[in-house]
Structure formats: C-alpha cells, structure tokens
Amino acid sequence: MVQRLKQHGFTACIAGAIMFLSSLPYLIAAVSTPSGHVYTWMLHNIDDSAVYLSWMKQVAQGQFFQENRFCIEPQKSVLFNIWFLTLGVLSKVIGGPLAYHVGRLVGVGGLVFAIARLAQSIFKDTKHQRLALLFTCLVSGFGYLFGGFSAARGFTGQPIDLFQPEISVFQVSVYSPLFAPALALIVVAVTSWINAESSHATKHAIVAGIATALLGNIHSYDVLHVMLSVLCIRVTNDVIQRRFHSRAWLLAIGAGVIALPTTAWVFYATRVDPLFAARADTDTRTAALHWVLIGFGIALPLAIVAVTNAIKARDLPKLYLAAWFIGALLSSQLPFAFQRKMLMGAQIPLAMLAMAGLLHVATKLKGDFPKILIGTAVLLALPTNVLWVQDAMSKLPANAGSTQMRPYLTTSENDALAWLGRNGKANDAVLVGPDPTSHLRFPGVALMPHLSVYIPAIAGVTVFDGHWSETINYGAKITSTVRFFDASTTDDVRREILVQNRIRYVLYPNKLADGPLADGTGAALLKSDGSPQYIPVRWSNGTLTSQTASPAYPVNPLGMKRVFSSRDVEIFEVVN
C-alpha cells in the first residue's frame, strides 16, 4: 500500500511538471501581450484550436449536436463529442479560453497516469517503471538535425516530429485539449488489452472496449490504430505460444463489439452529412516511411535492441509493445486520406521499448557509465521538443503562431467579435475582409482574412472564409473574398457574391493594426486613407472612418449599413 502511494505520488509529480512545462509557453505569451492587444490564449495551430473553441461555444449557446460553423453550406448535424460537451458546459461558467486549458491540463494528467499504468504492466522494477515514464513523456525524434520545420519541404518531405505533435507526448501536452485525452484513451485501451492477454480476465477486455468506445466519440480516427494494434498483439501471442487461444479471440471480439457503436455513429454521419464526409476526407497523407522512422529518433534503435532481447527471452509484454507499434504503423498506411492522423500514440510503445533496450545496454556497463548513458539518451531525445516550442515563441513578436493566424488581437478587433457574439445569430454568415499585411507576419501567405477563424470560436456565428480544412472549397472562397474587396470589382459582382452565399455581415479591417499597406497586390483593396474603395466616406478623423454614405442615403448601393465601427474593424450588415 505504501509503495503504491509512493508510485502514485511520483506519477503525480511528473504530471504536475509536464502540466507546468506545457503551460509555460502560454504564460510567456500572455505576459508578452503588446499594449492595445488581447491574447487569445492560443499558440500552436490556431486554425484547429479555433475549431475546438467553436465546439465549446456551441455548447455554451445550448447546442448539443456539433455544427461546422466554418461552412455556410447546409448540413445535417448528428455528431456530438462528450469531451467538448463537458468543456462547453464549463466554458459557460469560466469562459472559453480558461475551459480550453483546463481541458488540456486534465488530459495531460490523465495521459501521464495512463503511461504510468502501462509501464507497470511492462516492467517489474519500480525504478524501471519510473525511468520508462520519464523517457516516454520527454522523447522526440531526430527532426532537429534537419534544422526545424520547412514549409518548402511540406508534410511529406521531412521528419514527422517537426510537424506532427501527435507523435510526442510533450508536444501533445502543449498542443490542445483534444490530443492529450485522446492519446490517454489509446494508452488505456491498449494497456488494458495487454493485461487481458496476460490474465485472460474479462474485466480488462471490457475496459479496453469502453476506452475505445470513448475514443470513437472523441477522436474516431484512432479507433483504427487501436483495433489494428490489438489484432497484432493477439496474433503475436498465438504465434509465440504456438496455439490458438479461442477465449482470447472471443474477448477481443467482445471488446470490439463494445467499441463499435460510437465509431459506427461517426460512419453514419459521413453517410447522411456530405459536408462532414468532405471535411473528414481532407488529404493528410503519411510521409514516406524513412521520414516516419527518423521522426521517432533515438527510440527506434534502442527499441530494436529491446525487441531482439525479448524474442530470445520470449518476453511477451515487450513483444506486445512491438506488435502495438507495428499495428500503429500499419494503420498509417491504410488507404484513407487521413492516414497520418493514425500515427498518434505510435511513440508510446516505442519509447517503452527504448527504455528497455537502454536498461539492457546499461547492465553491461559499470560505475557511473549507466547513468551517463541514460542521461545522454534523454538529452538526444529532447531537442525537437525544445525546437518545436521555440519556433512558435519566436514568431510572437511578429504576431504569428505556428500558422499564419494571429495569437494577439487588437482590443477593437476583440470588441468587434464581441459585438457579433451579442448581435449575430448562429447561422448568420460573415464575410471577413483580407489582411493585405498577412505576408509580413507569415512569408508566403498573402491576403489571408486573419480574423475569420475567430468568428465561430469567439463570436459563435458562421464564417464564409474561415478554415483551410473545415471550410468546403476554401480556395474558391478565398478567391471570392479577394474579388469582393478588389477595387476593380463591380457592385453587381459584389452583390452576387453576397446573395449567393447568404452573407449577413461583412467584417472589414478599417485600420490595419500591423501597419500601412506594403503589398502591391493588396494596395488596390483600399483607398489611401484606409477605407473601402466601394463605400463612400462620410467623414474621417484619421482614426475612425464612418462609411455610411450620407444622411440622405443611409444604405449604400450594395444594401449594407455600418453597424459597428472601431479603430481597426468595421462591420456592415447586409439589409437587402
């Protein structure tokens, strides 16, 4: 009992340390907030973080089934997410950003305890369990040897640890409130199945099934990873023991039956909601195998040492880890557009095996050399995690995160979003004007409507041109956005864009907070005073511009009236 309490205490300390370290980038970003700005409490992949906040916002508004408010197309909402329902209810009490990070930290804690439970199932020695837990929480790949992420090399031409946080426990801990709990469920499911293989106890198979069912609701892609891994473990047991375990196969089938309903429901959603099906089919192919393996870093060669020893010793728990890793790799090669998403969790069994291999090598050394060896291995495993965080932090002075979206909004931009939240309805479509200075923050990305992702996340209404993956036909919609705001476009064409897309509000960057126009392409979007070319200026004091034509003509030819005005943003309502 005392030993168990000590072990739980150690795990809690590791969980607390990971929680703190994973929160540090956000805290630094918060205290670095520029004057006149508001921090969004997002940093990595703000695009997807905004999607999660949108789901939470919908729950706070009383919505049970999820809607994709980054799309204006009709949709049949049949999906719900238990985790984000919980966070959405919490957000109604404490606000979206705080609930977002509470969810992230709870997920991190659950993940660390799940990894500790796995270590206890693999290693008998308490010290070895602790080392395995530490190494698994810290390990990353060899991406740092390639100089960091390169947009030019894309997502298939460089080590995966540079752009896939799913394959690093630490990066998952920093990333979002979705990945950590999903990864924790993967670990719980497979660990429970490993325990079921060892004991043939029904209770472990039931836990594996329940964890997989929850995973199917929260992050359904990963169910394929779990099921293939369980299948590989099951086959490994029969091959090593040279017998067909009918009871174990029945337990596996039973666990699958328990897990099936939630995944079947998601599949049903793809049949009845073409919009969801198109979004789920976003092309995220797995990188070439050598980039995948390099992305696992030093853990891979050390794991090979462990597997070699496990085969000789017929050490089934460690061979189960190898089977798990093979199942994860196989799932990432299935003929689906979302291949690489299924690599999440593959680093867990590999890191456990790596520590086993490291301990084996260490036993052959004397004196301080075992400690030096283990310390060196940990140091070699850390740099990509550090580089990943440093890369995002280095972009903060330019008001950019890991993508081109802005971590900081000006106070008037935040006020505009608050106005939309108070006055707009959930299905009101908002057309967001392009930012002609976006390329200054994120080279190579010009004329991005940087406020668009925040419309569903903060205001809780629908956006026309919002998200590269969630918005159907995103490229065509960005083209329509630029065309609408181009000074050479006729009012007839603009009116057609408004009517065809049922636009209710147009959000226009009145005075861009990041400086005057510097882009030759974007210069045509504005008059010299920064106001829209196509809306007559009634008066201007250099900071605030009123664009409601004249007292005798309160609505401009496009059927829009100004309903909100601030230093940086104008909002126009389409009234006819």
Language-model features, listed with the residues they occupy:
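Hydrophobic/aromatic-rich transmembrane helices and adjacent perimembrane loops
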Residues: V108, L224-V226, F338-K366, I372-A377
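Membrane-interface transmembrane helices that cradle and orient dolichyl/undecaprenyl
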Residues: P181-H204, N309-A313
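Active-site lumenal/periplasmic loops and adjacent helix-entry segments of GT-C-fold
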Residues: F20-V187, S220-L224, K395, S402-P407, ...
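Membrane-helix boundary/interfacial segments in multi-pass membrane proteins
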Residues: I28-D48, F163-P177, F267-F296, P317, ...
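Transmembrane catalytic cores of multi-pass membrane glycosyltransferases
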Residues: D48, A211, L215-L316, F336-F338
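Extracytoplasmic
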Residues: G367, I372, T376, L380-N576
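Transmembrane alpha-helix segments characteristic
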Residues: H204-T212, L250-V257, I311-L334, L353, ...
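Membrane-interface alpha helices of multi-pass inner-membrane proteins
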Residues: Q171, V190-S192, H204-S220, L231, ...
